[in-house]
Structure formats: C-alpha cells, structure tokens
C-alpha cells in the first residue's frame, strides 16, 4: 500500500462517471472540507490485515502531528503499477474506513469512479508526506550460508589489506622474470595453460558467486574430472628414489607438523604482511595523550599502528591483541610516561623487552626491510574500526 498525505486547508470532490465496469456504489458523491488530511491511497497486490494495521498507525500518526479536523480516504491508482484487483481494493478501503471511524472523523471517496477534485495545501513541512507500507518479511538463513559459517571465516578489512599486500609483493617479485620474445598474433585457444586444483590445498570460496563459461578445445586431452576428484581424497603420491619408496603429500603428517609448531610458539604473520604491526594499550585514559604521541612518531616512520582506547580492562585489551595476532604490543602506564621508554611484548619470540621508540622502529624495519612501505589503511583508534 502507498499513501500520499496532503494536509489541505480546503478540499472538495465531485463524482463524474464510471472508471471501471463494476465500481462500488457511490454513497458519497461530493464533499467540501477544511483543515483535512487527504490520504491518496493505492492498494497493491498482497495487501492484507497486517498492512491495514500499519496503515492506520501511519494515518493516525500524521493526523495527530498536523492537527487536522478530519481524514479523507481517496482511492488513487497512480502511485503504483502493482495494483490489487478492484474487489480486493474495495474491501481493504472499506476496512480502513471502518477501523478509523472509532478514532477520527473519516470520509471515503468511492472506488471506480472518475472524480473532479480541488485541493489547497497548507505548505508547512509536514503538509506533504508519503508512506510505502509493506508486510513484515521473515528472512531465512540459506543452507549454503550455514556451511560457510561452519567451514569458512568472515572477510574483513584486514583480509582485504593482506590480499592486496601479498599480490603487490608477488607482482614486484616476479616481474623481472617475464620477457616478451615474440609479438606475433596468436589466436585464443592456441596457446593456453590448463591446470587442476584437485590437490593444491589453497583456500577456495565456499559459494561461487561468479560462475564462468570455459571453452575447452577437444582432441588435446581427455579430462576425467569426476573420477579424479572423487578419488583424490584417497590418493598418496609415491616417489621412487634409489629403489626405496618415500611417501609424501600425506595430509595427516602435514596436520601433525602444523599442530606441533603451534604448541611450540604462538601463530604469527610476517611483520610486513600484518595489517597492524604495533598496538598501544593505555592502562587508563590519563595515558592516552602519551599513547597518541608515540603512535604519531611510529606512523611517520611508516609503521602500521593503532591504539586500543576502549573503556575496558587491561587484561581484555591484551587478549584482544593476542586474538588479532599483533606482532608488537605495548602497554602504556606511569613508568613508560616517566622514563619515555616502551615495554614491548614481541609475539614471534614470546618475549618482553624494554625499548625506545627509535629502537622499536629499527627492529620492525630490519624485519620487513624493503616490504615496509605498504598503505596505511587504518585509523589511529581501535574503536573507530569496529
């Protein structure tokens, strides 16, 4: 349902002739009113009792705000192309009138007739309003999304940063390896590289939102994808070296080594790839200004830094930094402000060290070397990123 509200100082209409074969009976053929709220109303397909309830609430809301003396329900089919059939529209308009009768003085123009009308609008800020009234829709979570939540992980600004950083680094790394030897015209399909991702182990999207059409030129190789994919989970590749069998590409061993490495030290990302290289944790708000000064010095050196200035306990701030895999975590307290030195927790070595700002900058730059000049995508304060 769509309603156009006009708060009119003067409004009148006169019924002229039939607009459809079977209009409703024209009980009210003419009217003249002052200070009335005219509701030009279009009934759409699917409108029901829920729509009526919302429409009444909207009409009464506008009526009370503009302080009109009466309400006019005026059928108006020109606000939508998705019109309900005449019988349904008449029933809904009648119900709308009957439900409003007990609350306000209401008049309803007949449906299915051509009418001449005259209107004079007050022109104040609330004198012209429109409302589109829809049914409440219950949203269901798709089965595909359930699998994505179970096996996938949410994309974030951090992942976008890491993807761009990695692509940029690899492009610079491999660019010198490519040379153009022959610029002769080669048609599509005559020179191509075919490969399979059956055992690549790379992370693939859970839902392919952009399926592609691939043209394969026949007669080159018979591809047995269904058979190979189904059998890949049971495949063990065997390499023969000096007449002895060596088993490689065994998933269980890979997982074992990963788990063992996790037990030895916390998981880390290379410093050059980490979206945030340094996080400052002020113990309380009194140390926020000093934290900002330190952060600005680090930013000027190209270090990606932010401040966890949330009104929270220090323990929670340290846990958040650990969850985010921050390489260098610095707690800012009274000692740091007085001595102008930093107590830095280094994640990769699981150690705590006292440093000056200059020493911290040197350590990070020595680690990332030429890969340090990546874009600074992040604002200074952590709460502005959430």
UniProtKB/Swiss-Prot annotation:
Family recorded in the similarity comment: Belongs to the class-II aminoacyl-tRNA synthetase family. Archaea-specific ThrRS editing domain subfamily.
Show the SUPFAM superfamilies listed in the entry.
Answer: Class II aaRS ABD-related
Q: Which superkingdom does the taxonomy of this entry point to?
A: Archaea
Q: Which Pfam families match?
A: HGTP_anticodon (PF03129), tRNA-Thr_ED (PF08915)
Where does this polypeptide localize?
A: Cytoplasm
Which function does this protein serve?
Freestanding tRNA editing subunit of threonine--tRNA ligase, the catalytic subunit is AC Q97VW8. Deacylates (edits) mischarged L-seryl-tRNA(Thr) in trans, removing L-serine, has no aminoacylation activity. In vitro when both subunits are present, or if the 2 subunits are fused, L-seryl-tRNA(Thr) is no longer produced. Has no activity on correctly acylated L-seryl-tRNA(Ser) or L-threonyl-tRNA(Thr). Editing is probably catalyzed by the 2'-OH of A76 of tRNA(Thr).
Q: What happens when the gene is disrupted?
A: Not essential, however growth is severely inhibited in the presence of 0.5 mM L-serine, but not in the presence of 0.5 mM L-ser plus 0.5 mM L-threonine.
List the GO cellular component terms: cytoplasm
Recorded hits in InterPro entries, A to Z, give:
Anticodon-bd (IPR004154), Anticodon-bd_dom_sf (IPR036621), DTD-like_sf (IPR023509), Threonyl-tRNA_syn_edit_dom_arc (IPR015011), ThrRS_anticodon (IPR047246)
Q: How is the quaternary structure described? A: Probably interacts with its catalytic subunit (AC Q97VW8); a subunit fusion (in the order edit-catalytic) is fully functional.
The encoding gene is thrS-ed
**Keywords linked to the UniProt accession:** Cytoplasm, Protein biosynthesis
Name assigned to this protein:
Threonine--tRNA ligase editing subunit
GO biological process, alphabetically ordered:
translation
Q: Which CDD domains match?
A: ThrRS_anticodon
Q: What is its main location?
A: cytoplasm
Gene Ontology molecular function: any one = aminoacyl-tRNA deacylase activity
């Amino acid at each position: 349902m769509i309603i156009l509200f006009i708060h009119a100082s003067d409004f009148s209409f006169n019924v002229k002739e039939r607009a459809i074969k079977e209009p409703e009976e024209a009980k009210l053929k003419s009217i003249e009113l002052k200070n009335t709220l005219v509701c030009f109303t279009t009934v759409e397909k699917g409108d029901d009792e829920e729509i009526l309830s919302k429409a009444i609430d909207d009409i009464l809301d506008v009526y009370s705000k503009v302080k009109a003396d009466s309400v006019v329900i005026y059928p108006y089919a020109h606000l939508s192309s998705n019109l309900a059939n005449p019988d349904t529209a008449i029933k809904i308009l009648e119900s709308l009138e009957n439900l409003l009768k007990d609350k306000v003085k209401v008049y309803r123009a007949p449906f299915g007739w051509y009418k001449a009308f005259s209107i004079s609008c007050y022109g104040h800020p609330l004198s012209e309003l429109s409302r589109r009234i829809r049914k409440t829709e219950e949203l269901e979570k798709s089965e595909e999304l359930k699998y994505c939540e179970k096996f996938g992980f949410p994309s974030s600004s951090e992942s976008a940063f890491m993807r761009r950083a990695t692509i940029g680094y690899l492009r610079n790394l491999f660019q010198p390896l490519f040379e153009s030897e022959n610029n002769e015209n080669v048609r599509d399909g005559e020179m191509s590289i075919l490969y399979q991702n059956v055992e690549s182990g790379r992370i693939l999207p859970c839902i392919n939102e952009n399926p592609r059409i691939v043209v394969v030129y026949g007669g080159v190789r018979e591809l047995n994808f269904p058979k190979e994919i189904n059998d890949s989970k049971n495949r063990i590749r065997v390499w023969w070296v000096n007449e002895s069998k060596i088993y490689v590409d065994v998933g269980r061993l890979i997982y074992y080594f990963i788990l063992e490495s996790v037990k030895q030290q916390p998981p880390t990302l290379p410093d050059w790839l980490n979206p945030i290289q340094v996080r400052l944790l002020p113990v309380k708000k009194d140390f926020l200004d000093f934290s900002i000064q330190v952060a600005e010095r680090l930013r000027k050196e190209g270090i990606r830094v932010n401040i966890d200035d949330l009104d929270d306990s220090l323990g929670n701030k340290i846990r958040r930094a650990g969850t985010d895999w921050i390489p260098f975590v610095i707690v800012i307290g009274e000692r740091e402000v007085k001595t102008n030195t930093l107590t830095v927790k280094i994640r990769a070595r699981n150690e705590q060290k006292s440093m000056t700002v200059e020493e911290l900058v040197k350590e990070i730059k020595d680690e990332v070397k030429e890969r340090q000049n990546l874009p600074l995508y992040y604002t200074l304060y952590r709460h502005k990123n959430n």
